[in-house]
Amino acid sequence: MRTLKTFALASAATLIATAAQAAPTTWAYSAKTGVGASYEAYVDGAYKAGGKTGAVSKVWFSIADGVLTETMYGLIHEAQIKQMRIAVETASGLAIEGADTTAKTEYLHVDAAGRPLSPAYKITTTDRQGRFVIEKRIFTDPDRNALFVRVTVTALKGAVTPTLLLEPHMANTGGGDMGAASASALTAHEGKAFLSLKASKPFAKASASVLKDGDALAALKATATSAKGAIVLAGELPKVAKSETFDVVIGFGADAKAADQTAAATLKTGYAEVLARYNGEGAHVGWEDYLASLSQLPRLRDASEDGGKLLQASALMLKVQEDRTYAGALIASLSNPWGDTVDATKSSTGYKAVWPRDFYQCAMALAALGDKETPLAAFHYLPTVQVGPKTPGNTGDGGWFLQKSHVDGTPEWVGVQLDQTAMPIMLGWKLWKLGWLPDAELKAFYGKMLKPAADFLVKGGKVNLDWNTATITPPFTQQERWEEQGGHSPSTTAAVIAGLVVAGDIAEAAGDTGSAALYRQTADDYAGKLEARMVTTKGTFGDGHYYLRLNSDQDPNNKSPVEARNGQAPVAEDKMLDAGFLELVRYGVRRADDPAILASLPELDDEALEDLYRVRYSFKFPGVEGSFPGWRRYGVDGYGEDTQSGANYGANNQMRPGQRGRVWPIFTGERGHYELALAGLSGKPDPAALAKIRQTYVKAMELFANDGLMIPEQVWDGVGADSAHAYVRGEGTDSATPLAWSHAEYVKLLRSVSDGQVWDNYAPVKARYAR
């Protein structure tokens, strides 16, 4: 929902007065309205210098509440900055961006229809008392490790004095930094990570101080020019009588000299030239060129309801959120969920990491756009996160894919999720059938990656990695797609069946007919037992006949308790509704009019259920006719804000019974895909059916996006207290924005509508089970 953000976190004066209650060091607010990085062209499928975009820039930035927030340099998860705000001294007192301003996010470079052409932003923060306006233009230098911010301060009620307040989090932590300040630069470093902030005009005053009790504003009174620990760097800009523009560059490097020289070089190159290179204007190769390479973009625009604005933003977001050292390493989000209450004293990736499931969604969406290079790079990357003899600490069976890992393949979470082992096979088959993955290469990957994965989906094995010593017996998964429960999961099993069927095709192409037969036979076995394992006929809701979210044993009618998670008390499995069964239709395992599928929809869509169990919610938006559907992950989901206090999920490292997972835009896209499959049972859907899908599901996802065209992980459902952030119903929460999967689902829905058939459907699976 695109609204001007107007809530007040706290005034500058209040922040000073209450700083003693603040956490000493955290990350920033996670509802980003913008993220960006330079477009870098591959050289032989890798990121290295010498290609048409020259040197490789490895800097990413994010924006929230009008403020520059987490900025990464090096690997995509290596944050070096928490935030940079501007404090303004006025005749009537102090004001600080975020607390005392409203914020508006716009794209700096758009086409004639207003569609974004690059992830460069114009951020306008306006003082609530009408004393000043600040405009920031933010982008990176595509030829250097530098961030460029053009700042224009306009005084409206007398002269004002702006001061940059930079909070470094060098080496991805909020402590242990060394900082220094002078008239010419603000600098910080920890380990081998260095930054240097330079401005186009010398600082009138500059200081480096230690953050005390979370009070960054205290730096305005500091006089020291060096500090160590959790630090704040302050640089006072010249007084502004009317309107002044300052260019600010933050350079990064492996040592102080490199960072300083980088900042100076970018500043010397200048705003216009750096921006032109970033955008790809004229002879420069940049973001314009990437968008122009997307062969399907023009026709997908026609399937949108906003003229293609969110589509082009989604294309940018998917490509931005790729590492620039490990080509094809697609992460979940450039955010740390509920970051403003997450302890930053220890390094953490947040969502800036690889989950093969999210990764698959992104690669498939990029393929849907007609990007032939990134999905192939992604496929080539996958052995990096497959468990085998070379996985650090592994002494168990391999073939499965890590639950979550750093982009360099370092294991972070080691649960076994069978859908994450199936999806790499599904991606490989898709790229092969598109004609992008040659037969010879497919056969090579069959031996080294795809066959071990398919074998694990058949036989499972004994895991021995870190804490995990489980014996896996497919299709029973140790964790389903929400990483919380073990059992028979409709969504997981849908992917496993699809993965095995297409693995049969790949094995046959590789000459391994014995394995091909085994994979198909096993898929048939799993498919034949779906309803017996996962459909209850004695459920609590509706007529009692529906798919379970998960069954922890072989009997779907015994009301076994689901394990307690996220602060929630255990409930019987039949009381936990979700839409995971729709994945059976998406992949072709069941027809859209399958009796068990149809029987499960009334319970899923029942808006009369009490909020604890209810999954579907309808939303209205100001000035927009109609209501629009959204769904939670499942009933009794605790992955969200506390309904009693409004506190963030997991605040103070505590799980609370009042926590509640909200509505995820992903599921609006998933339902749109189901409705498309239903409309196409007898052939291509008719125009009226397609129009309804666009006006309902496509439009809803567009409305869930914020003014920066970022689609959140979760949107506020209006249930319970919201004292912390004053969310508007249908607005993104502090969980994670942009979520790459949300953008991927939107793109895939447009491709599916444009094609008149589900993009993620697998023809051999459908031919086998859903004719």
Regions found by a protein language model. Name each.
Residues 174, 188-212, 302-310, 398-410, ...:
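Extended ligand-binding clefts on enzyme/binding-domain cores
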Residues 301-331, 380-402, 423-491, 521, ...:
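Active-site acid/base region of carbohydrate-active enzymes
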Residues 154-156, 179, 188, 271-280, ...:
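Aromatic-rich carbohydrate-recognition surfaces in CAZymes
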Residues 23-31, 128-133, 141-350, 372, ...:
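Acidic/polar, glycine-enriched structural segments that form the non-catalytic walls/loops
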Residues 12, 24-78, 402-428, 560-564, ...:
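C-terminal capping/lid segments that line or modulate ligand- or cofactor-binding pockets
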Residues 25-125, 195-213, 284, 288-304, ...:
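An extended acidic
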Residues 152-154, 294-303, 316-321, 360-374, ...:
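Well-ordered alpha-helical scaffold segments within catalytic/enzyme domains
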Residues 337-348, 399-416, 464-488, 557-567, ...:
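Acidic/His metal-coordination segments adjacent to aromatic residues that form catalytic metal sites
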